[in-house]
Amino acid sequence: MNTNMKVTCAVCDSDRVKKIRKKFEAHYNQVPVAIENAEMYRCESCGEEFFTAEQSRKLSRQIKNRVREDLGLLSPERILEIRKNLGLSQAEMESLFGLGEKVVTRWENGRVIQGRTADVALRLLEMDPGLLPKLRKALTRSRPPKVYA
């Protein structure tokens, strides 16, 4: 964030704001999450507490990381490491798992939390990379036939 940027309160337009840290509680997909030292601003004029865009992005990353930890899911860094160790591109992994475009990118940069099924599949492939050719073969057999008019 630009440290020269002047922060003002959106409620009362005062520039008497102070950066604070406090516990922030939220729910992410019905999972309760508490971030102990969330950075935010408090207006000294009206008492409003708010986040800048950068603080909000940082808090969102912290919340998603906490949810991953609490649910026992792989971190974005581990997903990237597993994919690279398997020699797969992001597009190949998306095709292999039947995912939409850019889903793996979002997992790896932490913007989206992978589901339990994908997490287990990644762990299995990490434990036994020999499953990769078997998975590819199974996918070629299970694809619906092309319909020609």
Describe the function of each predicted region.
Residues 6, 40:
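Residues immediately within or flanking Cys/His clusters that coordinate Zn2+
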Residues 9-12, 43:
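Short cysteine-rich clusters marking metal-coordination/redox-active sites
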Residues 135-149:
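Short, charged recognition helix plus adjacent turn
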Residues 13-16, 50:
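Cys/His-rich microdomains that often coordinate metals
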Residues 116-136:
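DNA major-groove recognition helix of helix-turn-helix/homeodomain DNA-binding modules
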Residues 27-37:
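Short linker/helix segments within small regulatory modules
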Residues 52-117:
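Extended interfacial segments that mediate partner engagement and assembly in macromolecular machines
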